[in-house]
Swiss-Prot record:
The gene is lipA2. Keywords: 4Fe-4S, Cytoplasm, Iron, Iron-sulfur, Metal-binding, S-adenosyl-L-methionine, Transferase. It is an enzyme of class 2 (transferase). Its cofactor is [4Fe-4S] cluster. It catalyses: [[Fe-S] cluster scaffold protein carrying a second [4Fe-4S](2+) cluster] + N(6)-octanoyl-L-lysyl-[protein] + 2 oxidized [2Fe-2S]-[ferredoxin] + 2 S-adenosyl-L-methionine + 4 H(+) = [[Fe-S] cluster scaffold protein] + N(6)-[(R)-dihydrolipoyl]-L-lysyl-[protein] + 4 Fe(3+) + 2 hydrogen sulfide + 2 5'-deoxyadenosine + 2 L-methionine + 2 reduced [2Fe-2S]-[ferredoxin]. Pathway: Protein modification; protein lipoylation via endogenous pathway; protein N(6)-(lipoyl)lysine from octanoyl-[acyl-carrier-protein]: step 2/2. Belongs to the radical SAM superfamily. Lipoyl synthase family. Binds 2 [4Fe-4S] clusters per subunit. One cluster is coordinated with 3 cysteines and an exchangeable S-adenosyl-L-methionine. This is Lipoyl synthase 2. [4Fe-4S] cluster 2 binds at C75, C79, C82. InterPro entries: Aldolase_TIM (IPR013785), Elp3/MiaA/NifB-like_rSAM (IPR006638), Lipoyl_synth (IPR003698), rSAM (IPR007197). It comes from the Bacteria. Pfam families: Ivy (PF08816), Radical_SAM (PF04055). One of its GO terms (cellular component) is cytoplasm.
Length: 308
């Protein structure tokens, strides 16, 4: 991971003075943090916990959960909120990365693993085969470990929309055939803010991906996540939750966006803990089977807990 100091369109915006008092991450034990971080270095792996500076990584490590970042550490997309390095990655994915991830899972005795990836628009399959390969590698050495996937939209490679949709579904099928316990794809924000926040992705394309997952394998629950604090309104948040339910999305996470650096899109609002409780009740009322909502909630937070 690299932290850039170069000026961006956001650099001139004055940062917030201080995080609100309710933004207090659980650090976990220093020994547990060090153990995971050392193993990640030893096996030359990337984790979104570290790359994305997740505020919950100490708590997750302590509970036997970790999120591995596949396909390298450079993303072909340039989302305005994300800490992961942007650019054009090396053409080939490291074929031994799957084995190294499996070794790390075994050594750490992880109970629940989330596999995510940088966007790899440069590859024909957008990294779908690598997801499948890694799931199978983990199952060989840690058969009782549950594996969730958090994927990009697998979109691209064809101008014709009908053909592009067919290709996207074929990539999705590769991942779902490996039978993850949950398929996660994040909307991130409300429809109005998509273009600014998620460059290269679209709101309805993501909804269609979640819908397609349920159509391909309805035994695998689907999940999506939202960040608050980017300028969205309450009614837009509720509409987004309704849109997710309209494609039979069963799980949702709702958390506060925290600006990684001055190079990233600024926080417009820090929502109160009671607001997150409010949206949780609404989501549950809409029929979501599992809702995690709170200022520090992220996509993988308490992912190991079963849905109701």
């Amino acid at each position: 991971m690299t932290t850039t100091n170069k000026k961006t369109r956001y650099s001139a915006i004055k940062p917030s003075e201080r995080l609100p008092e309710w933004i207090k991450p659980s650090l976990g034990t220093a020994s547990q943090l060090e153990k995971v971080q050392n193993l990640v270095k030893e096996y030359r792996l990337n984790t979104i916990c570290e790359e994305g500076r997740c505020p919950n990584r100490g708590e997750c490590y302590a509970s036997g959960t970790a999120t591995f970042l596949l396909g390298g550490s450079i993303c072909t997309r340039s989302c305005a909120f994300c800490q992961v390095e942007k650019g054009m990655p090396p053409q080939n994915i490291d074929p031994n990365e799957s084995i190294r991830v499996a070794k790390a899972v075994l050594k750490l005795q992880l109970k629940y693993v989330v596999l995510t990836s940088v966007a790899r628009d440069d590859l024909d399959d957008h990294g779908a085969i690598h997801f499948s390969r890694t799931i199978h590698a983990i199952r060989k050495t840690s058969p009782t470990t549950s594996i969730e996937v958090l994927t990009p939209d697998f979109w691209g490679g064809c101008i014709d929309k009908i053909k592009a949709t067919k290709i996207q579904r074929e990539r999705l099928k590769i991942v779902l055939k490996a039978k993850p316990v949950c398929f996660n794809h994040n909307l991130e924000t409300v429809e109005r803010l998509q273009k600014e926040v998620r460059r290269g992705a679209t709101y309805h394309r993501s909804l269609e991906l979640l819908k397609a997952s349920r159509e391909i394998d309805n035994e695998i629950p689907t999940k999506s996540g939202l960040m608050l604090g980017l300028g969205e309104r309450s009614d837009e948040i509720i509409q987004t939750l309704k849109d997710l339910r309209s494609v039979n999305c069963q799980q949702v996470t709702i958390g506060q966006y925290l600006r990684p650096s001055l190079a990233h899109i600024p926080v417009q609002k820090y929502w109160l803990p009671k607001d997150f409780e409010h949206f949780k009740r609404i989501a549950e009322g809409l029929g979501f089977k599992k809702v995690n909502s709170g200022p520090l909630v992220r996509s993988s937070y308490h992912a190991e807990l079963p849905q109701t």
